[in-house]
């Protein structure tokens, strides 16, 4: 076959054009050392802070320390397969996790991979785990209630959608129980829940998942689990991964609730990572940015306005506000709320629910100390009927605690003091509540109404809870319309109040409890 010179050049041109070669420029480095999930890498000159790094055998890491001649990175997952001399590549991406409604009902790890043995999760989107919180202009004030179903909280420390309310207390005081009851209480209310378990035993996490399944709560809940056996890096990042999953719903005009159980263990994990990366330690050996660790996480919980949602969804969702409510949990040591991490988180959040060991051991469960528990913004979000009826509860309790201390020394008490003490005992008894039994609004309203109007004053303290239960059973049987009106309107009109008063009086005369 004869080709003249001009044809040769044309043929070469067409061949070169048809190659379609693409260049993938990526910096490559070498592992210098690996210790406890921390690796030092030489040669990654243009790596970004927080960038994902690719190790051999499909292992990924996260660049955290950018030094002059090396990079300090944490390995996500099993680090035993990484050794000195391995080649590491930059990916040009920061850490992302899968997001979307497909995650509901599943248990995933920090990276969003399923660990519940129910097969793969077919999510359509991913999102970065470190995001900037919505600005002041994008936010709406907290004005919608988030019912926990717990009498003591909904009446005295109300929580609103978009609020950050800290649950703080020693170990074994019922912190997780409050959080789980709150999740169960969201059934049928259109709230997607995210439960982030950090540094807990796998058996404990399994118990929580089982309880949520038993009460039909897993269908609207995502569980992000970083157990005690996971690496410190996975434990420290789990909260951010869970927050991103919750933000997916907030940004689309829906309501979400996220529980971090608990941020003390996350701070421990971050301290461990920081010390291994040779960052200078500060107070209690925590690194200097441990406040920022929690503030940038908790500031992402917010109620965003209609304009933010409309802009985010490119006009697909209009006229809807979205919210992400956060309930971080902090474990104290011997009731010391003035330690470093507790004071940090108290200053970041919009209030705290303080659980006390002494109350818990005395049988007051949930063991909420009403004196120092506070909700800074939830009052504006409280339902009208509960707000109307719960005004006297906190005062009664505060006076009771004060008088009870004096009554130990005084033998003869005047009638007014004795009445206040008796009322206080009944309030304390009424606020007790079994686990996994969150109340509806009408049930809370009836309980508050009976104690406020003195209907419990002549009921024996030991019979207060059985009186409450029997009364509600009778109301369900004979006054279903009244219950429905209170539940629908969240108000107690004069006519409804008169009907409720007559029903309670009738029950006291003829009811058995």
Curated annotation (Swiss-Prot):
The record marks 373 as: Required for activity. Keywords: ATP synthesis, ATP-binding, Cell inner membrane, Cell membrane, CF(1), Hydrogen ion transport, Ion transport, Membrane, Nucleotide-binding, Translocase, Transport. The keyword Mitochondrion does not apply. ATP binds at residues 169-176. It is found in: Cell inner membrane. It comes from the Bacteria. GO terms for molecular function: ADP binding; ATP binding; proton-transporting ATP synthase activity, rotational mechanism. Gene3D superfamilies: 2.40.30.20, ATP synthase alpha/beta chain, C-terminal domain, P-loop containing nucleotide triphosphate hydrolases. It catalyses: ATP + H2O + 4 H(+)(in) = ADP + phosphate + 5 H(+)(out). CDD domains: ATP-synt_F1_alpha_C, ATP-synt_F1_alpha_N, F1-ATPase_alpha_CD. One of its GO terms (cellular component) is proton-transporting ATP synthase complex. It is an enzyme of class 7 (translocase). Produces ATP from ADP in the presence of a proton gradient across the membrane. The alpha chain is a regulatory subunit. This is ATP synthase subunit alpha. It comes from Bordetella avium (strain 197N). The lineage of its organism: Bacteria, Pseudomonadati, Pseudomonadota, Betaproteobacteria, Burkholderiales. The gene is atpA.
